[in-house]
Each structure stands twice: as C-alpha cells, then as structure tokens.
C-alpha cells in the first residue's frame, strides 16, 4: 500500500541478488553431491552388506552403525566421499536390523529419514513407515506422537489429514505419560483444532502437565530459582536478524525476548572495554539476563553474582553499611539497592555453591535501607521462617512482606497469597495471585489456574483454568520443546526443512511463537514486492497457493493467541487476498487491533491509507490526516509522515478542484 517507485526497485534488486546467491549456493551443493554420488557408484561394492554383517545380532548391527556414524562425522581428515560411503553402510546396517524387528533401528531410521540427519535427503514416506512400524512393535510413545503429528498436519500424501487417527495416536502416547501428547491434545481441544472444542478435555490435559512440572521442575517449592526467574524465550527466526516478520517495524521488537537480545548485543560490544568503563545500567540488565538465561545466552548465577556486586559497590564501596559514596546519582543508588535484593535472593534460594543465609541477610539489610522490594520480601521471608539468629518472628515477617506487597513485588504477592490460602481466606488469595500474574510471576499462573479449576475464591471457569495452565506449561517447558533445535538448525546449518518441521511440531503443541515462525518459513510474501504482485492478480502455481493457505492458517492461529505481528500480517493477507479472499473490512479491523494493542505505527499508517482512498471505508481525507497526525510522536515515522501529509494535501486540493469543476 502506498508503494514508492524507489522502494519497488530496491526490493526487486535485493530479491534478484538473493536469488542469484541462493542459485550459486544450490549449484555448489548439487555439484558436491553429484561428485560424491559418482564416487559412491564407483565404490558400491564396499557398501554391500557381507555375510559377516548378517551373522551379527540386530543389536550389534545397530551398535556398529552408530559407531560408524559417530567416528566418520567426528574425523576431520576423512574425505566427504568416504563419509558418504560409510554413512550409507551404517544406514544399511540399521535397515537390516529393522527388518529383524529391532525397535532401536526403527527409531533411528525414522528420525534420520524424517529430519534429514547426516546429510540425507528427507524421505517422508520412509519415516512414516518406520514410525508406524515402531508404534506397532512396542507402542512407543514417541512414535505415536509423531504419527499423530503426521495425521494432524497433512504433512504429506503418505499421511493425509486424519484427525481421528491423530487423536488415537496421541491418546495412546498420553496414557504412557508423554507430556508432548498431553500438550497436543490440550491445545487441539482448547481451540477446536480438528476435534470438537472441549474446555473440560483441555483443562484435564493441561492440569496433568502442570502438576507434573510443578513437582518435577519446581519441586513443589515456589522459591525454586528457575521458577522465580524463568527462561526468556528467544526462539524467533522470523524477519531480518530475528527482529520479527516486519523487521525493525515489528511489534516483536518491544518484547522481553528482543529487549534481552538487544542487551546481549550491547554487552558483546562492551566486552572489548574494561569492566570499569561499562555503563552500570547495562551491567545491571546483563546480570538480570544471566538469572533468566535464554537460548543464545544461558543462565549463569555466578556471573550474575559478580555483576550485581560490581553495581552495588557504586554506592556501597565497603562492607560497612554506613560507608556510602557521596553525591551518587539517584539512578545509581536505585540500581545498587536492586542489586542487593537480587544478591540476597540468590544466596537465600540457590541450591548450589551460592547458598549462604548469612550473606543473604546481609544483602537484604543493605537493599532495605533504600526501600528495595526484593530486600523487604527477603527479610520478611527470613523472619517469618526463623532463618536468622533472632528466631521466628512472624509479626515482623508479615510487616516486611506487606511493605513489599505495597510495591507490587511478585514474590511477596505469591507468599501472602499462599498464607491466605492456608487461612482459608480464598478470595484474598485469588486476588493476590491475580496481582502477581500481572507482574509475570510464572508460579502465579499455576495457582490462578487451580483457583479457576476448583472454584477457589472465584467462580469455576474451565476456559480460564486452561489458559493459565497453558501459560505456566509453556513458560516452564519452552526449553524442552523443539523450538531451540529449530533455531539451531537454521542458524548453524541453514537447514530450512528441518527447522520448519521443528517449528511445526511446537506449533501443534500451541506455542504462538512457533506458529508464526512456521508460517513465516512457508510465507511466499515476505517482501513488499511479493504482496504487490499478488495484489495485481499475479498468476501463482499450485505450490504457492498451498503455501499461502498454510501461512494464512498459522498466522491466524498465532493472531488468535494475541500475537500482534500475526494480527498485522493477517490484515495484509485480507488486504491482498493471500490464502483467503480479499476482505478490506477485515484487513482494516486487523490493522486497528494491531495499533490499539501495541501502538504499532504501520497499523495507523495503513488505516489512514484506506480512509484516504476509500478502500473498505468511506473516503475521508480528514480522518486520514488525523490518523497520520497521531504518528507525529514516532521518530521512525518522521520523514515518511511528512511526505504522506504533503501528498494528502495535494490529494485534498485535487478533490476540491474536481468539486469546483463540477459546480461549474
């Protein structure tokens, strides 16, 4: 919409450059494979299994195949052709073992063929065959999960869409305790995806996973650090440098994950400088980031401890509480106090070498002098449980906890909520959990879901319980999903097929981030030029049409979960008629929702354009101008905004001139 000639030609030029680069890369890879295949054809005799191979037991053949693969793929002085020969020999060993009903061989072959491991071209037909053999041989939960996945996605003609079979396979896996199967069933029941909508079924499966995770991951202890500071989910690939489907203009750039990545990139730039020259606000953010951890920046409590200490010393340079640096800026004092609170929590709740109650108390006392809420909570917790030399003092503990609650501290809100729950003051407990949830306390999601499920302090609501259980499950299980592997496959190895499959697997479990990435990888309209061609009825192939339909479906699913970029993308799909008939009214609604929920400038821009030209709206240049005026506070929109307003003025004069001529 409103495409300039310059943008058109730049986009076209970049697309041609990318096409040439991909062609050369593909040609190089193809020549390498052809040369390797010629070498293999000339040495085919060495790949034929001997009588000795067949004399071995199936288990020995599997073991030898794995040793061959491990050895040749770890050696640096072996030629590529030799690796291919030995790889094929190993696969033949696995195939012979699978024919003798060895279930390990079936599993290895299924994964190799499906995910294209060891540089094998993925063969969906073979992978379906081996997964099917495996689940029939021993009822493997993993094989049943994969068969359910095949049937739920119409992944190929070898396993067409069959919701009934998908459900059967997942239920078989769920009965064996597979958390993936429970998550598949929960999400599909929740949104009526290829099965009847059922809040009761959804909550049943989500509750099973939540209870399991709460016991295994949190140890039924709300002070477990991985639950206090959950992992940041930075598994996004979509867009330039993972910035979101619209690059720098994406709503994703305002997310916690992107802000964490931005902090990490600043940190990497600062590493070349002496630590004394660092910006202390950045140091504080990096320390917090190390508490949570993320795919590209794992958690490290020791590093957090060092950085927080460094920040705290900017106000308390010595061990004495009264020894402070005069004329310290208030911003540094605030960071130093917050650092003390984090240090106290680390020493109090760590299960490793950082655990030290005396140090925790010392840090909390410092932070409390500057009204740090974590420090109030820590001192209150220790007094309530008698963890200091003064023994149990619940009155003092509650007084300090309430000070933290007044500052909306999520840990204190949870602590007080649990106390109210024990006292059977259910309504108060429910509202405290709700307040903690607004502060993104992961543990509170579990307790809120329990409240809705049991009708504790609020009316029963299976849909609300399902949604909160879902938030808890997805926060705790994120690192155990296939999204991390998906990002690695595409970032490290450039295997788009494998990455797509991994994202698709997580998408079927209900992760909105996986849904938008699966859609993006299948999206034929990543660039503006693609959408313009579609707008003017550009002829497309059957494959492109199938890709459009797939992308539309998964963008729609992510949009239904509240992903702003997906909502905006859906607006584009309705506007240009991609994967769905053109519907300007729905497009306008999507742009409006995207703007209202995130203040994304492009939404307002497109709404103004539609009003200016009367597309799906009554033509009204005055409304268009008013909408554009709202963008004036956005620095990134300054120049295009001035151009657009200038053009609107010209357009307005043109319309007035036409009216004048008609009057004559």
From Swiss-Prot:
GO terms for cellular component: endoplasmic reticulum membrane. Sel1-like repeats lie at residues 141-178, 179-214, 337-372, 373-409, 410-441, 442-477, 564-599, 601-636. It comes from the Eukaryota. Glycans are attached at residues 101, 138, 221, 300, 371, 454, 537. Residues 1-35 form the signal peptide. SMART domains: SEL1. One of its GO terms (biological process) is ERAD pathway. It holds the Pfam family Sel1. InterPro entries: Sel1-like (IPR006597), Sel1_AlgK (IPR050767), TPR-like_helical_dom_sf (IPR011990). Keywords: Glycoprotein, Repeat, Signal. Belongs to the sel-1 family. This is Uncharacterized Sel1-like repeat-containing protein C1B3.10c. It comes from Schizosaccharomyces pombe (strain 972 / ATCC 24843) (Fission yeast).
């Amino acid at each position: 919409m409103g495409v300039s000639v310059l943008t058109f030609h730049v986009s076209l030029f970049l697309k041609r450059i990318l096409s040439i680069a991909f062609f050369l890369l593909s040609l190089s890879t193809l020549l390498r494979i052809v040369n390797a295949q010629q070498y293999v054809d000339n040495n085919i005799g060495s790949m034929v299994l001997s009588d000795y191979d067949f004399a071995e037991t199936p288990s020995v053949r599997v073991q030898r195949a794995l040793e061959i693969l491990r050895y040749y793929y770890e050696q640096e002085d072996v030629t590529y052709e030799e690796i291919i020969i030995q790889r094929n020999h190993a696969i033949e060993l696995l195939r012979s073992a699978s024919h003798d009903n060895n279930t390990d061989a079936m599993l290895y072959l299924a994964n190799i063929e499906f995910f294209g491991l060891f540089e094998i071209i993925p063969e969906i037909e073979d992978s379906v065959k081996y997964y099917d053999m495996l689940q029939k041989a021993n009822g493997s939960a993993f094989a049943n999960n994969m068969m359910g996945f095949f049937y739920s996605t119409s992944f190929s003609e070898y396993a067409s869409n069959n919701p009934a079979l998908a459900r059967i396979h997942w239920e078989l896996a769920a009965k064996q305790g597979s958390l993936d199967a429970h998550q598949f069933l929960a999400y599909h029941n929740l949104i009526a995806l290829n099965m009847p909508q059922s809040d009761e079924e959804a909550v049943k499966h989500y509750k099973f996973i939540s209870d399991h995770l709460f016991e295994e991951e949190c140890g039924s202890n709300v002070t477990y650090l991985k639950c206090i500071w959950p992992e940041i989910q930075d598994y996004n690939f979509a867009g330039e440098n993972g910035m979101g489907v619209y690059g720098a203009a994406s709503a994703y750039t305002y997310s916690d994950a992107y802000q964490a990545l931005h902090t990490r990139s600043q940190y990497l730039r600062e590493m070349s400088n002496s630590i004394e020259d660092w910006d202390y606000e950045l140091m504080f953010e990096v320390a917090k980031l190390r508490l949570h951890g993320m795919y590209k920046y794992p958690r490290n409590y020791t590093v957090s401890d060092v950085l927080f200490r460094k920040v705290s010393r900017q106000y308390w340079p010595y061990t004495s509480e009264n020894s402070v640096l005069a004329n310290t800026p208030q911003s540094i004092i605030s960071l130093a106090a917050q650092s003390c609170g984090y240090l106290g929590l680390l020493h109090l709740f760590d299960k490793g070498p950082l655990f030290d109650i005396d140090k925790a108390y010392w840090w909390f006392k410092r932070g409390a002098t500057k009204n740090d809420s974590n420090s109030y909570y820590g001192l209150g917790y220790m007094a309530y449980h008698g963890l200091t030399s003064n023994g149990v003092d619940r009155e003092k503990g509650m007084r300090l906890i309430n000070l933290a609650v007044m500052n909306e501290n999520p840990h204190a809100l949870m602590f007080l909520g649990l106390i109210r729950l024990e006292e059977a003051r259910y309504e108060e407990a429910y509202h405290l959990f709700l307040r903690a949830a607004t502060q993104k306390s992961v543990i509170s999601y579990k307790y809120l879901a329990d409240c809705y499920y049991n009708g504790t302090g609020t009316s029963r609501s299976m849909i609300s319980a399902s949604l909160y259980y879902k938030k808890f499950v997805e926060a705790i299980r994120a690192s155990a999903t296939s999204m991390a592997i998906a990002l690695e496959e595409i970032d490290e190895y450039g295997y788009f097929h494998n990455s797509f499959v991994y994202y698709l697997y997580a998408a079927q479990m209900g992760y909105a981030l996986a849904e938008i990435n699966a859609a993006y990888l299948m999206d034929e309209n990543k660039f503006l030029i693609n959408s313009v061609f579609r707008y003017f009825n550009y002829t497309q192939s059957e494959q492109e049409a199938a890709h459009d339909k797939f992308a539309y479906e998964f963008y729609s699913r992510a949009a239904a979960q509240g992903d702003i970029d997906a909502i905006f993308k859906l607006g584009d799909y309705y506007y240009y008629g991609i994967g769905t008939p053109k519907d300007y009214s729905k497009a306008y609604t999507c742009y409006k929702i995207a703007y209202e929920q995130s203040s994304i400038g492009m939404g307002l821009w497109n709404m103004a354009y539609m009003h200016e030209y009367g597309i799906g709206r009554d033509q009204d240049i005055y409304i268009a101008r008013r909408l554009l005026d709202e963008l004036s506070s956005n620095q990134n929109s300054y120049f295009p905004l001035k151009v657009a307003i200038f053009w609107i003025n010209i357009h307005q004069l043109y319309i007035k001139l036409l009216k004048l001529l008609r009057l004559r």
